[in-house]
Amino acid sequence: MPFTMTDENVPEGLTTDDFILRPITAADAEPDYAAVMESREYLRGWEQTGWPADDFTVEANREDLEMLERRHAERRAFTYTVMDPAETECLGCVYFMPTDARSFAGARITPVGDRRWEDYEAAVYFWVRRSRLETATDRALLDVLRTWPAKDWSLRGHLIVTSELFTQQVGMIERAGLQLRFTVEEPDKPGRYLAYE
C-alpha cells in the first residue's frame, strides 16, 4: 500500500527525554557517519549486505543522505536521524518505507497467522549505534516507534521490521512483546526479514 497521508500528516519529528527524531539531511553526514562506522559490524547483518564497507567515507555517506533527504521531500519514504538531546551525537536512524516499495515487490512475503500485508501502510526499520545498546536506547526507541506512528501519523497500520541475522534486535523486539506477523524473503539476501506488530 502506498503512503496516503498528506504533508500535514508527516511529523517534522519528535522530542523525548532521551533523544530527538528529525528528518535526516546531508548536513548530518559526519555525525551519522560516526554512528554508522561504530556500528558497521552489526549493520552488515541488519542490512544483509557488505554495507558499510571498511573504506566507506564521509563523502559517500553524504551522497547516501542526499538521496534519503530527496526521498523524504518527495514523500516516497521517510528517514529520521536519532540525535541525543543536545544534538551533538547521532544515536541511530529510523526509516519509514511504504509496504508497496520496490524492495517488497520482488520479495516473498509470508504471513504468520491471518494478517494481510496490504492492510499495513508502513514498514519501519531502525538501528541504534553500538555504544548505546547497553543503555537500552534501542528499547526506548522501539517503545516510541510502537506508538508514534499511530498517534501522530495518519498511517493505516505499521510493522516494525528487522533482519533475522540481527539477533540482538530480534531478541529485544520479542522481549518487548511484539508479535511476528510476516517473514520477508528478498532475492539475494542471506536471511529473512521479520515484520512485527
Give residue ranges: language-model regions.
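GNAT-family acyltransferases
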Residues: 1-131, 148-197
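Conserved acetyl-CoA pyrophosphate-binding loop and the N-cap/start of the following alpha-helix
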Residues: 132-145
